[in-house]
Amino acid sequence: MQGGGYIKKELIRMKLLVFGATGKTGRALLEQGLAQGHAVTAFVRNPAALEAQAGLTIISGDVTDAAAVSRAVAGQEAVLSALGPRGGNYGVLPGGVQIIIAAMKQAGVKRLIHVSSYGVGDSLAQMGWVSRKIVVPFFLRKALDEKEIEEGIIRASDLDWIIVRPGGLEDGARTGVYRCITDPLTKVGQPRIARADVADFILKNLVDEHFLHQAVGLTY
């Protein structure tokens, strides 16, 4: 689906806050967001991991620090979450998602786009045998269980949320050509997509309401 199936609109420049900005998907969000003229704030534990750039504000903090998250969220127009566990440190991020949501409510920021994964919830049934019987249960179970908790927290909020479920993440250039799947009966086999195209989808949905309050699978 070219460009996610959207009518081309005039670019809207916004104030964006990115969590997970030092990961590969987060970096793709920073690169494309800045290239589009957005004012981007990266919330990171290690500011030295990012280079200073025009239009980029780097804030040091931990997602479990409610005061730091609240300061970062204040004044933003959308929050983009590309958070993922590091080094098998599970159990932390669902609490971080709760803190982000609370900060957004306090600041009056409505749009949250959160990166989850194929294999979470009803999307597991869409995947091929190898993914369902081998890859997910033996290699991804803990990570996807945590993502499912995060999705539940987001769904229970009154924010304008979109959950993004990419297939297997790859390096590669942005193509703008991928499938956006919301029908749980659609079979996808072994889904895959470049991180750059995940960022492309997210940035195309900063104000669009087509996928509002839905989990969207992304794959080629």
Q: Where does each model-flagged region fall?
A:
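Conserved Rossmann-fold cofactor-binding substructure of NAD(P)-dependent oxidoreductases
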Residues: 57-76
